[in-house]
């Protein structure tokens, strides 16, 4: 398939620049992957769509304030966007400035040059930066960093984004983009789901800035995914086995939860084992033709045209069904992307 097969026209006014006042106030488009049937609703309908015995899998990554402004020792301004933390003192990052810094270049970060760092090495498009200040990377980012809103939101971050560009169940710092399907859940909805007899499990995938990078090839088979760190612990393995045994569905909240679960499943297939814990980088690329191993239902936002994420969803529910759903969503003026509306999708099984 060609990347252009996943194109759709999206009016600029349908890109959500701010979240709804309440997390659960978003709209929800329901898609049956077996027949393409659509139903419009509200995100609160999720409570009616889940059943006792289902297992809902969330990504508990926490978004770090990964965008930092500063200058080079020569005085030139720069912007650093963390891709991932390497250790307590070092990061891999995208750097925007008039002239790329060379190894050994001193950097001063923060509005008042609060922190000093050094550019150590370049790895393709990414720069390895080591902080020479006493504080850890996380302490520095929490002090002078900004929330890394996606480029299509096209506004400076605000104080409210520190809460709203973060799930209510976030736990492990490391993401530089939110697992956006999870932004719709609030404490009440999750408590109501628990009361109904729904089980929860938590994977971790630290979303990288690469999630916003355009696919630069024509044929999707030629695309190579960026690496992201994943944790699928023993508790998740046990919860999946228990849900399958009782006939419950595995419902993934977001494409990051899907990629975490399916990475563990692919690893098990490769090693000829049952599902086991998975800790490490994944470069899994899911597109039409992929056979899902674990996930039965998917809750996800509306994704960018020609992105790897709309390809993943198309593999889950069928290409024609998904493109038809997106056409309906545009005509029905759903809100798109990170702060936008969501879908609840049953997997195509036939």
Swiss-Prot record:
The reaction(s) this protein catalyses: 7-aminomethyl-7-carbaguanosine(34) in tRNA + S-adenosyl-L-methionine = epoxyqueuosine(34) in tRNA + adenine + L-methionine + 2 H(+)
Coiled coil stretches, renumbered: none
Subcellular location: Cytoplasm
Top-tier EC class: transferase
Gene Ontology cellular component terms for the protein in this record: cytoplasm
Pathway: tRNA modification; tRNA-queuosine biosynthesis
Family per similarity comment: Belongs to the QueA family.
NCBIfam families xref list: PRK00147.1, queA
Role description: Transfers and isomerizes the ribose moiety from AdoMet to the 7-aminomethyl group of 7-deazaguanine (preQ1-tRNA) to give epoxyqueuosine (oQ-tRNA).
Protein's name according to its UniProt entry: S-adenosylmethionine:tRNA ribosyltransferase-isomerase
Annotated source species: Vibrio atlanticus (strain LGP32)
């Amino acid at each position: 398939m060609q990347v252009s097969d996943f194109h759709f026209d999206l009016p600029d006014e349908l890109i959500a620049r701010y979240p709804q006042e309440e997390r659960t106030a978003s709209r929800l488009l329901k898609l049956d992957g077996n027949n393409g049937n659509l139903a419009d609703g509200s995100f609160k309908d999720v409570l009616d769509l889940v059943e006792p015995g289902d297992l809902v899998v969330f990504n508990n990554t926490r978004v770090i304030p990964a965008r930092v402004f500063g200058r080079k020792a020569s005085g030139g301004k720069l912007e650093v966007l963390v891709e991932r933390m390497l250790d307590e003192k070092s990061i891999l990052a995208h750097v925007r400035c008039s002239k790329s810094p060379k190894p050994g270049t001193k950097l001063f970060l923060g509005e008042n040059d609060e922190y000093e760092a050094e550019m150590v090495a370049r790895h393709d498009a990414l720069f390895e930066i080591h902080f020479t200040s006493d504080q850890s990377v996380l302490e520095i980012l929490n002090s002078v960093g900004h929330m890394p809103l996606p480029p299509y939101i096209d506004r400076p971050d605000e104080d409210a984004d520190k809460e709203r560009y973060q799930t209510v169940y976030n736990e492990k710092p490391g993401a530089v983009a939110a697992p956006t399907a999870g932004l719709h859940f609030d404490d009440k909805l999750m408590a109501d789901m628990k009361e109904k007899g729904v089980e929860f499990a938590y994977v971790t995938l630290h979303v990288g800035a690469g999630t916003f990078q355009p696919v630069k090839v024509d044929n999707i088979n030629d695309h190579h995914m960026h690496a992201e760190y994943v944790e699928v612990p023993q508790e998740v393995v046990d919860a999946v086995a228990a849900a399958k045994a009782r006939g419950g569905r595995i419902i993934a909240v977001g494409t990051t939860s899907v990629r975490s679960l399916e990475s563990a499943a692919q690893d098990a297939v490769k090693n000829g084992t049952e599902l086991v814990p998975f800790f490490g980088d994944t470069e899994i690329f899911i597109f039409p033709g992929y056979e899902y191993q674990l996930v039965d239902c998917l809750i996800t936002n509306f994704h960018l045209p020609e992105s790897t994420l709309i390809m993943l969803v198309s593999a889950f529910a069928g290409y024609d069904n998904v493109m038809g759903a997106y056409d309906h969503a545009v005509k029905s003026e759903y809100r798109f992307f990170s702060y936008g509306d969501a879908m609840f999708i049953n997997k195509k099984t036939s």
